[in-house]
Amino acid sequence: MSNCASVALKGIPRDCASSVGGINRVAIANYSDIKTVTLSTGSADTAAEITQIELKPEAKWNFYHFRKGSSSLVETLNVDQATGLNYVSSELVMTFARMESAKRAEISALALNEIVVVVEDSNKQYHYLGYSEPVAASAGTGQTGQAKGDANNYSITLQDDSETFPYLLSPECAGTVFSTDN
């Protein structure tokens, strides 16, 4: 834990830019396939961000796409003053329309692996889950629905517990990660 007196507050100015909810796509790799992750130190004017992710030879990113409004990332700060507990729990809920064998198999594989995840949100920000420790599945569902208008889908929740909110990727690093996504 850092010295609390050494943490400088800087304030947050009002942001007039539009902000859109939701996620566009996700890149996932096995945790064991990550060779290095380079984190910039940041400065008085900039926050630390991930500037490079190097995979081991033969390793690759796998890409996941969703219907609009069907998936989300929630980052929750958990603090207990009495015990000194302070961590961030990030939950990525990915929902895939239509129950099919290939999707069932992929959900099952995700549930068993230790992974890292890059989430592209609707504001073109890229969140890195798995910096401190592997991301793992914490829940999942498959549902047929009851009526014609009900959802028929698979859903999986991937969880990351970390000391901080997930680091964002630099635009160049994000471009490299998603460069092979068709």
PLM regions: where:
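Short acidic, glycine/tyrosine-flanked loop/strand segments centered on an H-E-D-like triad
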Residues: 89-96, 121-142
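Solvent-exposed edge beta-strands and adjacent loop segments
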Residues: 2-4, 14-89, 134-148
